[in-house]
């Protein structure tokens, strides 16, 4: 008998299920993707909820499913419009993978999200968690859906001290959930675990006295709930120093640039920018040389207007922001010139939305009497 089997034998699993599910059915939050448990909408919500808080997701979800209400609508949509609808949520590979996957659903499965574990799990961007969450919630399949919330809850329930930052640890929790999950109500069970982790069994200050499964919790019994789960610390993100410029011409049109189709923030739009180096030249001087060499642009460039910081999981951008008026341009093939009204139609990463906001505030100040 392995350690997990020994821990499972000590639990009244049926009573745990009953206590968790009855609490969830009584206390669950009203969330828009729970209204009809449509497989497509559940799928969209689960993709949005990766790395993003529920409160942030709700308005994005409502706008997204209004604009793309069905598999077919999203499959047939122009990528620019999809990226614009996702603008601000970040982690844009999520929505690119989602659109690729729904195209396959439309083509291979007649627009119906496949209920089969192998079929759905084979779609682009569908990992073990998304597969378990969507199929259990929408199709009532008894499949584990193990994310950080669930690992935290179950590490405390079963007193599991394995490092949850290590990929191999996930299999321990998947095995545990297979033993625990209700075959009659897998949707309510998985959602109950997620809800418990979000509302009660929180990372730093769990509300153990309010917990519906407190009597089943080994960590509560041992007084170790604040020590679990074990999670090794990530490396500090690297720092990239950059300079960006909001360039306008004499008509007030703005120059923007599209990022490459692969890599970080692929296919999003941004203002001309470069990675700067410490040395003899100032950031402003480096920017002047970059505009000349890359685009053949000569411009009157302001002094430093401010700095925008944006934090990714693995990287921090520190962007020095400048404004400029184009005097001469010899090659605009790498840039797009748009009006300020047209600019609102393009999807920009959050960092460059902040830059544009900074430009708008500066213009408002200079225009003030």
Curated annotation (Swiss-Prot):
Cofactor note: Binds 1 [4Fe-4S] cluster. The cluster has a structural role.
Domain of life, per lineage: Bacteria
Assigned EC number: 3.2.2.31
GO biological process terms on file: base-excision repair; mismatch repair
Annotated [4Fe-4S] cluster binding sites: 201, 208, 211, 217
Annotated keywords: 4Fe-4S, DNA damage, DNA repair, DNA-binding, Glycosidase, Hydrolase, Iron, Iron-sulfur, Metal-binding
Cofactor(s) listed: [4Fe-4S] cluster
GO MF annotations in UniProt: 4 iron, 4 sulfur cluster binding; 8-oxo-7,8-dihydroguanine DNA N-glycosylase activity; adenine/guanine mispair binding; metal ion binding; oxidized purine DNA binding; purine-specific mismatch base pair DNA N-glycosylase activity
Annotated residues for binding of DNA: 33-34, 51-52, 89-91, 129, 313
Recorded catalytic activity of this chain's protein: Hydrolyzes free adenine bases from 7,8-dihydro-8-oxoguanine:adenine mismatched double-stranded DNA, leaving an apurinic site
Catalytic residue positions: 46 (proton donor/acceptor)
Record note on disruption phenotype: Cells lacking this gene have a 100-fold increased spontaneous mutation frequency. A double mutM/mutY disruption has a 1000-fold increased spontaneous mutation frequency. Triple ytkD/mutM/mutY disrupted strains show increased mutation rates during exponential and stationary phase.
Site feature (Transition state stabilizer) residues: 147
Pfam families (alphabetical): HhH-GPD (PF00730), NUDIX_4 (PF14815)
Stated induction or repression of this protein's expression: Expressed during exponential growth. Expressed as both a monocistronic transcript and a mutY-fabL-sspE transcript.
Domain spans labelled HhH: 108-137
Gene3D superfamilies named among the record's database cross-references: Helix-hairpin-Helix base-excision DNA repair enzymes (C-terminal), Hypothetical protein, domain 2, Nucleoside Triphosphate Pyrophosphohydrolase
Entry-linked InterPro entries: A/G_AdeGlyc_MutY, DNA_glycosylase, Endonuclease3_FeS-loop_motif, HhH-GPD_domain, HhH_base_excis_C, MIG/MutY, MutY_C, NUDIX_hydrolase-like_dom_sf
Signal peptide as annotated in the record: none
Job description of the protein: Base excision repair (BER) glycosylase that initiates repair of A:oxoG to C:G by removing the inappropriately paired adenine base from the DNA backbone, generating an abasic site product. 8-oxoguanine (oxoG) is a genotoxic DNA lesion resulting from oxidation of guanine; this residue is misread by replicative DNA polymerases, that insert adenine instead of cytosine opposite the oxidized damaged base. Shows a powerful dicrimination of A versus C, since it does not cleave cytosine in oxoG:C pairs.
Family membership: Belongs to the Nth/MutY family.
Protein name as annotated: Adenine DNA glycosylase
Top-level taxonomy: Bacteria, Bacillati, Bacillota, Bacilli, Bacillales
